[in-house]
Amino acid sequence: MNLEEFKLNDSNAEKQIIKPPKEISKKVNLQSSTSIGELEKYLNQGYNLNHNLIEGKVDSKILFFFGKCHKQDQKILDNKSGELFDRMLSSIKLDRSNVCLASYIPRGLENLYDDEGFLTQIQMVNYRLIEIVNPKYLIIMSNYCIKMLLATDLSSMSLRGKWFDFNTPNDTTPKKCRVLYEPEILINNPELKKDAWEDLKEIQKQLGG
């Protein structure tokens, strides 16, 4: 090999060395997430989320927040509970297509409902979810959701029947919040349906229906 050939090979080696590296995807940051899609990507970094965090209309002015689904559920509030929920919505001229529906424990991750590490993380995810959706009205269903979202051991029976303000830690605009009996409670306690109907009428009144 002569000097010119050596220089040529050396030059080619340098070109290979300085070849730009492949772009590395950045991790999604929770607080910088500005859409539900980004929030789902954030959660997928640590957990196998196979379902959407939100069902229905993402930009609805009313967000119904459930507690946790059953493993066999194909949607948030399914089977008999889902049928009753649909009738409850219909009674005030609403349906799943024009409300926003979320579950505190995302569907498909029900087995993590008592995992302390997950619960710490999902609390902040749900706060951010509320901030992104930014509903005018927040309707909380289930004692589990009350305990986790409102940080209280009071039951739906104690909290229903009135409006109150709810703020996430980073939210400056309070949401008008109300507790509504979850369908399963109404199925097991039909005598509570009268109270639920009064709550539904109040929700309809606020929505201008």
Describe the role of every protein-language-model region:
Residues 2-209:
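A polyanion-binding, active-site-adjacent surface
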